């Protein structure tokens, strides 16, 4: 009843279609007041506060800017160097693009959070949060695609055939279609507008059932990826001893590290989301600090390019070339030759299919161990 006195206009519209309320700014205030169990005074203070960016937010804006630049470097490296024009590296490029999107989405989230949240319409709020979910979904699906590609490469299953490139890009496209669909479910209609009792405390316009569904889907996918990698390791261990020193095995170790870092960074955030589905704000005060856990998860997007750089000699060289071209390093490279695509006779296809390509020079030149 108190809520209705404060927001009489909302109570009159509560029986209307949820889509007709997508541009009602009052709706945001009602959902935050109810889901976060705030008093009217607390809500008013948050709306009227002139909060500037905190030092922590400024730090994460800097980190996200680094994330964008790092992953842009990965994309440029994959595009320029013919050695990286293989299924594996295109999937890594896809992961880099999702990380770049995550960095951009988090910057937007920082600038649209705090008191600014209450000046958003529901549709703007759904776009703000949905973009972050799309980036997360794309990362998870990219990791699944990489695991499938590694399994195919190790077991030498011939599934690509003559249409290898076409099928590879179809798989990447499917990753993004599924990600956009998953992140767009709330704005399509799976939200808690007109049903305040089901609202998430962390994401007050999303229903708890959607949060539970997303976390369940991600958990199943990550478990499937772990099973695939366990299967791959068993195959490698039982194969010829030489395989453990091959570039393909080094590549396998790198993507396993990427998976492990992803799980470590995102596990606290997933735990908070699961807690949110079964616990009210006053019963679980830790939900008030959910932003810290999501900030920690964002670090995953900054670590992936560092893993590629530390694990791959070719990737390090390519990063240095791009930095030289941008004038950040003095390498004495002629400017007109800076962005010329590099050609290489070796590729990860040669590394992966060692038994099919016995040419010694090719194997000696193949130093990519991402």
From Swiss-Prot:
Primary location class: membrane
Alphabetized InterPro entries for the sequence: GPCR_Rhodpsn, GPCR_Rhodpsn_7TM, S1P_rcpt
Topology feature Cytoplasmic, residues: 79-87, 150-167, 231-254, 311-370
GO molecular function: sphingosine-1-phosphate receptor activity
Gene Ontology biological process terms from the UniProt entry: adenylate cyclase-activating G protein-coupled receptor signaling pathway; anterior lateral line neuromast development; anterior lateral line neuromast hair cell development; cardioblast migration to the midline involved in heart rudiment formation; cell migration involved in gastrulation; cell migration involved in heart development; cell migration to the midline involved in heart development; convergent extension
Transmembrane regions listed in the UniProt entry: 58-78, 88-108, 129-149, 168-193, 220-230, 255-275, 290-310
Family: Belongs to the G-protein coupled receptor 1 family.
UniProt function note: Receptor for the lysosphingolipid sphingosine 1-phosphate (S1P). S1P receptor is critical for cell migration and epithelial integrity during vertebrate embryogenesis. Receptor for the chemokine-like protein FAM19A5. Mediates the inhibitory effect of FAM19A5 on vascular smooth muscle cell proliferation and migration.
Name under which the protein is recorded: Sphingosine 1-phosphate receptor 2
